[in-house]
Amino acid sequence: MLNADNGTYDSWYWAHPPMYMPQNCNLEDVAHIKNFVDIPVVCAGRMEPDVAAEAIAAGKIDGMGVARQFLADPQWITKMIEDRIEDIKPCICCHSGCFNFSSSKGHYNTQDLKDTMGLARCAINAETMQSKKHYIEKAKKAKKIAIIGGGIGGMEAALVCAKRGHKVTLYEKSHQLGGVFIAAAAPSFKEKDRDLIAWYRRELTKYPSIEVKLNCEVKNIEDCKADEIIIATGARANRIPVPGVEKTIQAVDYLMGNQEVGENVTIIGGGLTGCEIAYELFLQGKKPTIVEMQDDLITTPGICLANTSFLRDFFEANKVPVHLETGVRAIEDDGVTVKGKDGVEFKIASDNVILSVGYKPMPLEHNEKDKHIHVIGDANKVGNLRTVIWGAWDVAMKL
């Protein structure tokens, strides 16, 4: 049998397609291979079961290879057989738990070595390959738990607490659950992220012990009459102290569709969010430019090389302007004045400027000495989906 996909260690993203690559991205090539062999051929790489079934029925391939979806939801095959598709927790191809090897310019691996060796875990399923660390155990005493913030961390904590036998009240100040992950899931290539938000919303309704209060902002933590309080209020976007910064569009505002942009768009900040915005703008036919102070794009540890190398290669192949080691001097109505690594200032003509320079924790004011108050997710320390979900388990298991 041939288990076929694409890629080499120089183009690792073909063998482990991130969310930026289309579904079933290897199918055409693998189907071509079958024309030249007389043994079964299996295709892997973001395969969709319905598409794979059609390809198998048509004789194009003999089987579908799946790995990451089993990490996200080990019961997904059973759920498919039982026609419980909406119960399947979708893999979002983030690689944050299963292939946690990150790299940037001049560094072979920027991830902690102990963490790098922990392969085959899952960012969105804390129990996967961590059954001795993360597991559901009924609480010795049922408690009233108040969770402030209905983002991914708050929803995950609510589910774990409910499974352990607690009564949960989840407060969300907006009209919908999802938090900042709604913005993160907005790009066209993030369909699985949007599916994950929908999964969480459905899952919460299955537990009578969880009460969700939308459009309910908690301003005084003392108003929460609970045995334990979990603060999951997320983070706020950073700003940079340069003239004209008020002319910029915050990354979250752009992703939420609050502001339209023109053809030429400069993104200040070459981290993951900034690069994903640039990628989305290019897919829309616009002309993005990235300005980054560091010597490479996406230097934050914990972001898989398969994801970052795809974006770097994509920008290079498609001649997307990327200005590294470049600082912003001023933002004007018609562009951005920057200073390059050679010390020379120049202007980048822009219809709009998007600011994507990270976040700061935004916990609700509270007594830090109160042992019954717990801060999780980005409200505690800005991280990624993996740190948010695993951190929710770390707290919820102790209550």
Where are these regions (language model features)?
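Flavin-dependent oxidoreductase catalytic cores
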Residues: 1-148, 152, 156-168, 176, ...
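Internal hydrophobic alpha-helix adjacent to the cofactor/substrate pocket in enzyme cavities
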Residues: 73-79, 279-290, 388-399
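Glycine-rich dinucleotide-binding loop and its adjacent helix/turn
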Residues: 125-139, 206, 212-214, 233-284, ...
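Rossmann-like dinucleotide-binding cores of NAD(P)H-dependent redox enzymes
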Residues: 167-206, 280-326
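A conserved short coil-to-beta-strand element within the FAD-binding core of flavoproteins
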Residues: 213-224, 236, 324-335
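Glycine-/small-residue-rich beta->alpha transition segments that form the dinucleotide
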Residues: 226-228, 232-238, 254, 350-362
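A conserved FAD-binding loop/helix module that cradles the flavin
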Residues: 277, 300-307, 376-399
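C-terminal catalytic lobe of FAD-dependent flavoproteins
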Residues: 336-338, 344-368, 375-377, 381-390
